[in-house]
């Protein structure tokens, strides 16, 4: 996916997203930086970072999905236990392995600043849940999320973009 920023027109700046993947029901196109209804693309949403910089982060639905998965991996399979039974809980080594596999899976997301912050927040959530349910057991250490290398932005005149945008 590529982002094209067109020159300002009075009070607006037009952002054009180009993708080599056809759109499906996961895309919703609207005002890009609306905090209540952000631009979403696949598992990402466009947002502003703490310094006001525009960045991609994991969408709210995906962040909640991973929080629920972490809770289930650490605390058990879910569901109601039978009368007098304790809820099923994975043995600590199995739970640790499953959490680390999930952490490894999250490494496939790009290392953008917003995505890195979201994965770090998930790692902190995992540590808190682990320490509350497995006291005395060492918590799983998540791998460090790789940085996405910054590339020099490419510029083009509007006449060159005219054929691309039609």
Description of each model-found segment:
Residues 1-26, 43:
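Catalytic palm active-site di-aspartate
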Residues 18-39, 49:
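Helical (often loop-to-helix) elements that flank the catalytic cores of nucleotide-handling enzymes
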Residues 34-166:
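Right-hand nucleic-acid polymerase module
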